[in-house]
């Protein structure tokens, strides 16, 4: 757990006692609300899973009741804000050494008060060994589940629900982890589980899989033979020896057999011709390190060739590896990857999983929860409560390898609605939301991590100011600061800890940490005030636009969209202006914009397209509240409606920064409809539809959108997608390829990013794209 790591706890008995006496929300979070349990007990590690309800605060908005009033007061806010308690579902997964199982069971027993179940699902070899202990301590009946079924269910679950779950290991890259984007169709695949032996399973669907092969030569062989050869009894110590060894001192290589003639055979002289081949004739003693390395290569090559043969036999090109033998150790992933690449000639991909250690526990939980049908929901990793993929490299010293202390944690929140791909993606399997991978780009990574760290004071200040009546707001805000700061330091050292590191993941982690400490919407009052001001300006803006000629109006509408996008409290350059100059408004923002030609300027092509037939239906992803949505987006929407184009306006399901939420957009649209007959009739006739995206992020992942939105896009035949804002159109989706026309527009409000793109602060991106025929 992160807190144990931060306080210097290790794996000694003393540190366990210290950990176990921490409050339950430090390790077994929300344990008092746990409803269902599952456990996976292996040879050395226990993985506990439980489902709990989580009570947290949410900001709700609703229109004022104006019944009985002749007129609304001029400066009355457009809606009222209330903070309410909401209950959501969360899955918790905890991994710890078997040494601590009894102490952990005692801790659970002492804090378990609301469980609804009388049964705990158990899998793994230890389910038999510890059955009586579990039943005695928890007073729950142990139902043993099939190990392989649990592994498959767990694997399917993480592949579907956790972006960047799978990765390839590349020895010579920096970093070594290359994460894969979520594939919408995960089947079929081969799962190779390397425990004591090896099991190879072909997985064809959610419920159809078969054991197709295996081997008695696996992790247990490495451990057993390694112990005989080196007198080292601990598995991790064996790997540590292997990481420092030189196998060519023990193995007979191709060049040792053929000399220089190996080149005529088309073979590398460094290939192993015979594992341990030199030990039969050499007189010298071999080092423990060299023998461990030779043994590791021998077993990994055997497993790799076996996996490759089965993959080819079943025409599969993806092989996922898991089990005790892997456990995130670079030395094992490196040898497995080399073996697969060699024997398949690069045609089969060796893939590893961030959370492979939890697969059995996840699967056992899913088996026990089948009546609740957990697979009908979408789930999301909660970065605030997860310890991430930490390096378990035996090359690291014990202090570095302590990782997050005695416990590793994973938390997943149940999302309100199922998430699916946008139907308009050109090629969903190849879609990558993020424009820059910060794990690859060291310069950008350093800049953005520093940028988010320097912004912490402002975020804390805003969080406290959003709850003036709360006596503990400052204390909670400081806890938020510490937790997010710790996450940033982890990412400096291990940028791959939560998958691919991006600006989006940094923003989302910050939102998760704010929610963790009950700051659900720090900008709610700012948005309320700015929406009120912008609504009062709306009639005048529309009158000015209507007075223009057609061509002049089109440019004015686009400039209005761009000027509205300036009002982004997440941008330091803008928030500084907004805080220092209360009179900075729509016209001032227009004057900030770059003059044409813009940094990216497809406006002429867009104008030419507008001279053609109207689009059938436009899908618009909105960005900020206030001037952006009201004076920028709605006049643009109104013009499309006048052209005969239906509009789907998609806004965030939940709050993030000052981005407009779906519930806020409903009230704003209602108020605008009261002032504008075009919008009023479009809402009445359902030519203007307001929907939620399913997201609570300042960025946009088009592969995880609300299922209802996707259905509406199909039903209405959307043929234009408009994405506005830096988060949605630059940090994400800048390179997204769609099957229809698209507009991506934003004002660059970060000087470093603007310079990197070849522009200056407040440069304009206006990117109109037409798909190839």
From Swiss-Prot:
GO terms for biological process: coenzyme A biosynthetic process; pantothenate metabolic process. Residues 403-773 are annotated as: 4'-phosphopantetheine phosphatase. Pfam families: ARMT1-like_dom, Fumble. Its cofactor is Mn(2+); Ni(2+). The modification Phosphoserine is found at residues 393, 404. Acetyl-CoA binds at residues 196, 199. Phosphatase activity is strongly promoted by several divalent cation ions but it is suggested s that Mn(2+) and possibly Ni(2+) represent biologically relevant metal ion cofactors for damage-control phosphatases. The modification Phosphothreonine is found at residue 406. Keywords: Acetylation, ATP-binding, Cataract, Coenzyme A biosynthesis, Cytoplasm, Hydrolase, Manganese, Metal-binding, Nickel, Nitration, Nucleotide-binding, Phosphoprotein. Activity is strongly promoted by Co(2+), Ni(2+), Mg(2+) and Mn(2+). Activity is inhibited by EDTA. It is linked to Cataract 49: A form of cataract, an opacification of the crystalline lens of the eye that frequently results in visual impairment or blindness. Opacities vary in morphology, are often confined to a portion of the lens, and may be static or progressive. In general, the more posteriorly located and dense an opacity, the greater the impact on visual function. CTRCT49 is an autosomal dominant form characterized by congenital cataract located in the posterior region of the lens. Visual impairment has onset in early childhood. Homodimer. Interacts with PKM. NCBIfam families: panK_eukar. Phosphatase which shows a preference for 4'-phosphopantetheine and its oxidatively damaged forms (sulfonate or S-sulfonate), providing strong indirect evidence that the phosphatase activity pre-empts damage in the coenzyme A (CoA) pathway. Hydrolyzing excess 4'-phosphopantetheine could constitute a directed overflow mechanism to prevent its oxidation to the S-sulfonate, sulfonate, or other forms. Hydrolyzing 4'-phosphopantetheine sulfonate or S-sulfonate would forestall their conversion to inactive forms of CoA and acyl carrier protein. This is 4'-phosphopantetheine phosphatase. It comes from Homo sapiens. The lineage of its organism: Eukaryota, Metazoa, Chordata, Craniata, Vertebrata.
């Amino acid at each position: 757990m992160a807190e144990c790591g931060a306080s210097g706890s290790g794996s000694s008995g003393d540190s366990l006692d210290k950990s176990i006496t921490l409050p339950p929300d430090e390790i077994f979070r929300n344990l008092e609300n746990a409803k269902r349990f599952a456990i996976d007990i292996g040879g050395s590690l226990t993985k506990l899973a439980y489902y709990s309800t989580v009570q947290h605060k949410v900001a709700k908005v609703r229109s004022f009741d104006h019944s009985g009033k002749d007129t609304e007061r001029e400066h009355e806010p457009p809606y009222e804000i209330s903070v309410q308690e909401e209950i959501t579902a969360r899955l918790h997964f905890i991994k710890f050494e078997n040494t601590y199982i009894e102490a952990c069971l005692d801790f659970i027993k002492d804090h378990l008060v609301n469980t609804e179940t009388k049964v705990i699902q158990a899998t793994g070899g230890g389910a038999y060994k510890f059955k009586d202990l579990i039943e005695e301590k928890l007073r729950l009946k142990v139902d043993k589940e099939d190990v392989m079924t649990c592994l498959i269910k767990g694997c399917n679950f993480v592949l579907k629900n956790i972006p960047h779950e799978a990765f390839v290991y590349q020895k010579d890259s920096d970093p070594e982890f290359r994460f894969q984007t979520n594939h919408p169709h995960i089947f079929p695949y081969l799962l190779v589980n390397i425990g004591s032996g090896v099991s190879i399973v072909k997985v064809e669907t959610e419920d159809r899989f078969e054991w197709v092969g295996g081997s008695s030569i696996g992790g247990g062989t490495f451990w057993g033979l390694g112990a005989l050869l080196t007198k080292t009894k601990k598995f991790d110590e064996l790997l540590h020896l292997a990481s420092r060894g030189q196998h060519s001192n023990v193995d007979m290589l191709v060049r040792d057999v053929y000399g220089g003639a190996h080149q005529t055979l088309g073979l590398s002289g460094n290939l192993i011709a015979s594992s341990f081949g030199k030990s039969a004739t050499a007189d010298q003693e071999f080092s423990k390190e060299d023998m461990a390395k030779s043994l590791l290569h021998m077993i990994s090559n055997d497993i790799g060739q076996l996996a490759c043969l089965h993959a080819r036999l079943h025409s599969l090109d993806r092989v996922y590896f898991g089990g005790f033998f892997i456990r995130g150790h670079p030395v094992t992933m490196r040898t497995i990857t080399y073996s697969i690449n060699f024997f398949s000639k690069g045609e089969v991909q060796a893939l590893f999983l961030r959370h492979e250690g939890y697969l059995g526990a996840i699967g056992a939980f899913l088996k026990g929860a089948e009546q609740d049908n957990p697979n009908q929901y979408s789930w999301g990793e909660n970065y605030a409560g997860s310890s991430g993929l930490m390096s378990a490299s035996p090359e690291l010293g014990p202090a570095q390898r302590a990782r997050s202390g005695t416990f590793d944690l994973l938390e997943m929140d149940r999302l309100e609605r199922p998430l699916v791909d946008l139907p308009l993606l050109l090629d969903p399997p190849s879609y990558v939301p993020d424009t820059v991978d910060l794990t690859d780009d060291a310069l950008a990574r350093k800049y953005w991590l520093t940028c988010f760290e320097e912004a912490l004071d402002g975020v804390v200040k805003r969080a406290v100011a959003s709850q003036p009546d709360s006596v503990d707001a400052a204390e909670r805000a400081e806890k938020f600061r510490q937790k997010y700061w710790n996450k940033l330091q982890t990412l400096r050292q291990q940028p791959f800890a939560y998958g691919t590191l991006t600006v989006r993941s940094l923003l989302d982690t910050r939102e998760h940490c704010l929610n963790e400490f009950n700051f659900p919407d720090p900008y709610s009052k700012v948005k309320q005030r700015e929406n009120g001001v912008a609504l009062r300006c709306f009639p005048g803006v529309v009158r000015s636009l209507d007075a223009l000629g057609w061509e002049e109006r089109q440019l004015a509408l686009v400039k209005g969209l761009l000027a509205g996008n300036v009002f982004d409290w997440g941008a330091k350059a803008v928030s500084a202006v907004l805080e220092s100059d209360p009179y900075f408004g729509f016209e001032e923002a227009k004057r900030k914009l770059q003059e044409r030609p813009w940094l990216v300027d497809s406006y002429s092509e867009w104008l030419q397209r507008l001279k053609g037939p109207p689009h059938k239906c436009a899908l618009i992803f909105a960005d900020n509240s206030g001037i952006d949505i009201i004076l920028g987006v709605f006049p643009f929407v109104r013009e499309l409606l006048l052209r005969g184009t239906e509009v789907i306006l998609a806004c965030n399901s939940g709050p993030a920064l000052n981005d407009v939420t779906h519930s806020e957009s409903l009230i704003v649209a209602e108020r605008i409809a009261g002032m504008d007959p075009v919008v009023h009739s479009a809402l009445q006739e359902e030519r203007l539809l307001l929907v939620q995206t399913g997201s609570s992020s300042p960025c946009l992942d088009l592969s995880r959108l609300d299922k209802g939105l996707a259905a509406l896009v199909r039903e209405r035949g959307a043929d234009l997608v408009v994405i506005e804002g830096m988060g949605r159109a630059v940090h994400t989706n800048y390179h997204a390829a769609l099957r229809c026309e698209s507009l991506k527009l934003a004002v660059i409000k970060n000087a470093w990013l603007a310079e990197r793109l070849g522009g200056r602060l407040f440069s304009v991106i206006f990117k109109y794209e037409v798909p190839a025929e």
